């Protein structure tokens, strides 16, 4: 069931709290590990092994009608956001920053970009294809995904991104403009505010640090 704004508001702050606390505790723990990036989210101890929060391998449909999973792309680092094409507020700002990330890493085969629409009613595969074409980007590098609404909302939760059905919000959605960094094991390793160019500039070094540690 798709969540309403009232039910999601509590989840929104819960996720922010989880990410913040996890980030602070693990950041302290990483000081003796060459300042490695933290793992965000809850972790479990199973048979003595630490199991970090992992984004599930959802089945998605891209702008070319291909059904894929994250694991379809092999050992990549992923930069992901959630948007919808008719969004009149934060999405155009986030798009500009995603384009900056695309330009910076377009020749780096280790990095891919994922944009997930939260408006399944209007953002069909055909619309996503046209949107990608108008951006002029390589869709082998930057994928535009759709899926069943419940799946996309659940995926956003796993990325720690707030997505809410809200009739009072522009076009009926209230959502976060965060850009999320995922390592090749689908662990959330960092994020930036996609509406803030300075946050994205600082994020470059975060991505570079992950690449340096993931591909030693």
Residue ranges and their predicted role:
Residues 95-155:
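Structural microenvironment flanking redox-active thiols in thiol-disulfide oxidoreductases
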Residues 35-71, 96:
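N-terminal "domain-start" segment that seeds a small globular fold
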């Amino acid at each position: 069931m798709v969540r309403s704004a009232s039910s999601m508001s509590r989840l929104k702050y819960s996720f922010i709290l989880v990410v913040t606390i996890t980030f602070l505790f693990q950041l302290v723990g990483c000081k003796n590990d060459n300042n490695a990036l933290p793992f965000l989210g809850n972790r479990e101890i199973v048979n003595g092994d630490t199991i970090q929060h992992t984004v599930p391998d959802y089945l998605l449909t891209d702008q070319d009608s291909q059904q894929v999973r994250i694991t379809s792309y092999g050992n990549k680092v992923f930069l992901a956001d959630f948007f919808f094409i008719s969004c009149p507020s934060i999405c155009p700002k986030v798009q500009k920053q995603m384009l900056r990330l695309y330009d910076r890493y377009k020749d780096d085969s280790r990095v891919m970009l994922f944009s997930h629409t939260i408006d399944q009613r209007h953002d069909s595969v055909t619309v996503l294809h046209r949107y990608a074409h108008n951006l002029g980007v390589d869709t082998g590098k930057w994928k535009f995904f759709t899926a069943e609404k419940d799946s996309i909302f659940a995926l956003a939760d796993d990325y720690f991104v707030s997505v809410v059905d809200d009739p009072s919000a522009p076009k009926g959605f209230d959502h976060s403009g965060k850009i999320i960094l995922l390592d090749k094991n689908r662990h959330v390793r960092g994020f930036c505010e996609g509406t803030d160019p300075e946050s994205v500039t600082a994020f470059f070094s975060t991505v570079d640090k992950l690449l340096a540690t993931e591909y030693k």
